[in-house]
Amino acid sequence: MAAFQHRAKRSKNGASAKQGKISKADKKRAKLQVEKLDKRGVLLAELTAAAPAAKTGVLQAASLAQDQRSDAQAQQQRAQERSNVDKKVVQQLEAIAGFSL
């Protein structure tokens, strides 16, 4: 058996095509994009600096305490709702079965 040989890519005119070459269309497209940015007056430095730095803030103890209280209240309400649902389910089962659990 003959070993498998890779064939070089050929261009339309039969000459071997260079791999990794940037096409003329890509060059033109990039050039037009750069010109559009220049017309708008946008510089590369402005684009990179456009994202403002995140502001560092100090955690407020009062707001944290208030959030904890509201979370505790919400947890209590959910626990109460769960217990109410459990009681209703038990009542329905007792009604269906005809005896109390």
Curated annotation (Swiss-Prot):
Region spans: Disordered: 1-30, 65-87
Residue ranges with Basic residues bias: 1-12
Stretches with biased composition (Low complexity): 65-78
Protein name: Uncharacterized protein AFR743C-A
